[in-house]
Amino acid sequence: LVQSVFDSVYDKYDLMNDFMSLGIHRIWKKNLINMMNPSIKSNLIDVACGTGDIGKLFLDNTRKNLSITCVDPNKGMISKGKEKLNNYKNIDWKVATAEKLPVQDNTFDFYTISFGLRNTKNINKALTEAYRVLKPGGRFLCLEFSKIQNSNLDFVYKNYSKLIPLIANFV
């Protein structure tokens, strides 16, 4: 079900994210990148990469010719990402799931997953894969929604969440 939703929205995914989050997702992603502080030899795997926002921010903010791998289970997302970031030659795009990454053990300094962990079929397996592909001392960074503790905000969030499918159809 989740993949069929992404199959239908990949060409408008970026616009949809901006619209649904009022652009706030960009601030969260920028903060994620700022937390990394990569070295000259750092590399990154971005899982559930969508159209490559995290990879682009990583390369733009490091201003280094670092190697990154962008992984998403949706071929349309990967295609849109390649099109959007065609000037970035050091991105290796892969169609795969978080539960079965087609990369060697102990490869990456950073593993990111943004708003994708909740969409995996098996969170424990996805986390095991993250651990497998990270180098010893590598960093796992995850952006994800969580339960709201404030009952007033929870009411707003739950009702807004019901609108998201309608918004997706509109966009």
Language model regions located:
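Conserved class I S-adenosyl-L-methionine
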Residues: 139-168
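A short acidic, Gly/Pro-enriched loop at the edge of an enzyme's catalytic core
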Residues: 99-111
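N-terminal, positively charged/glycine-rich alpha-helical extensions of SAM-dependent methyltransferases
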Residues: 1-14, 160
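A short glycine-rich, Lys/Arg-flanked "PGG" loop and its adjoining helix->strand segment in the class I
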Residues: 124-136
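Class I SAM-dependent methyltransferase SAM/SAH-binding core
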Residues: 43-100
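Short glycine-centered segments of the SAM/dcSAM-binding site in methyltransferase folds
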Residues: 43, 137-139
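A short SAM/SAH-binding and catalytic strip from SAM-dependent methyltransferases
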Residues: 109-122
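Conserved alpha-helix/loop element of class I SAM-dependent methyltransferases that forms part
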Residues: 22-42, 57
